[in-house]
Amino acid sequence: MAITTPAAITATEAWAQREPKRAEAWFYLGGAYGARAQWRVLRSQQLGAARDGKRIKDALERALALDPRMQEAYFGIGLYRYYADVAPTAAKLLRWLLLLPGGNRVEGLRDMLRARDAGHLLRDEADFQLQVIYLWYEHNVPEALSLLRGLRARRPHNPLFLQLIAETEDTYLHDITASQRTWQALRSARAGDDAELDLGLAELRRLRGNDDV
């Protein structure tokens, strides 16, 4: 990510400068900044991530100004608005010090759902980001699971979705039986030894108090 993202940003910045009236250029520039922002969040680089958030919002708003039909652009804007509102106090103080725009939880979620329902390019990414939001912030576990199961149905060869379903069933619903079935399906899908799967099944055995998992 750290190697390829700068190249993507350089290329899309050049594209936007070369064709400033091309909505797609600004849309993909926002996407390139988004990749770097996620990488910075994972590395706890809050200052850089906050600045990238502003760049994402600006690029996508410019794309929409050039082409209001570009529904996908609403997703990144909504994501910024949502997290800017639900962020911890320290992050909000950082935003204030950097003179970054404020957020709105309700409108941000509305924008994300609008992009998900009307767009085509970002459906899977939107569902993945939304399941995190529903799980962690909206406390709507059934909706999060519904999105994960939809991702699993559309991307059956990606084992991540099965793993997340199993973890959610266990941690949030305390449905050990359902979690057991999902972990076993994941083991079958991977068809081999996997340390993470063994740990998951071992935890289920501990919770059930037997070795029938």
What are these regions (language model features)?
Residues L97-G102, R116-H120, L148-H157, A185-G192:
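Solenoid-like repeat scaffolds
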Residues M1-R69, F75-P142:
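Short coil/linker segments at helix-helix boundaries
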Residues W26-L29, Y33, A59, Y74-I77, ...:
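TPR/Sel1-like alpha-solenoid repeat signature
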Residues E19-P20, G48-A49, H139-P142, L173-R181, ...:
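Structural helix-adjacent loops and short alpha-helical linkers that scaffold large soluble proteins
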Residues E125-E138, L148, Q163-Y172, Q184-S188, ...:
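Alpha-solenoid helical repeat scaffolds
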Residues P88-A91, H120-F128, R155-Q163, A191-G200:
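Generic helix N-cap/helix-start motif at coil->alpha-helix transitions
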Residues K57, A63-A65, R155-I176:
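C-terminal intrinsically disordered extensions
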Residues A8, L109-M112, P142-R149, S179-L186:
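Repeat-mediated protein-protein interaction surfaces in helical alpha-solenoids
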